[in-house]
Amino acid sequence: ASEGKTTVAVNLSLALAQNGYSVLLVDADLRKPSVLKNLGISNLSGNGIADVVNGAKNSSDAIKYIEKYKMFVLAGDESITDPTEMLSNAKTGEFIAAAKEKFDYIIIDTPPIGIVADAAICAKYTDSSIFVIREDVFPVPAILEAVSDLTQGGTDLAGCVYNISTDRSKGGYG
């Protein structure tokens, strides 16, 4: 939907890392992973969340420290045949729980909520969620339903990012 969710996830991760926090950015959008592309990284294939969950790699091998950005990244992998099933796997929850012990912040980039169940599934592993909304894409009832889906999973909604707005008459900076 090009709402900018990956850009928000990457920039939040970068801001936290630049402020000295230990950050893990997880690309859980297994249908269209784009975190690495957004960071300008092309050499981490075979080091994704699916490799950890299916036991092909342990997390310390799959999670890569990106010196340039001072943060850790766990790549996505679009070759997974059933991303929803993989993200629902108990091992995914175990991995996130273990990662919470090692990192100050874990930022999880997911597919857009409402299109597939993946975002709502990942929300149950989080302490809070940020909902990225692109102007004029979804009607208000669909947005409210998506917020309900997120919070029913047990996550707190930290806030919303109203993104890619074209209306400059409402104020702002610049």
What are these regions (language model features)?
Residues 1-174:
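P-loop NTP-binding module
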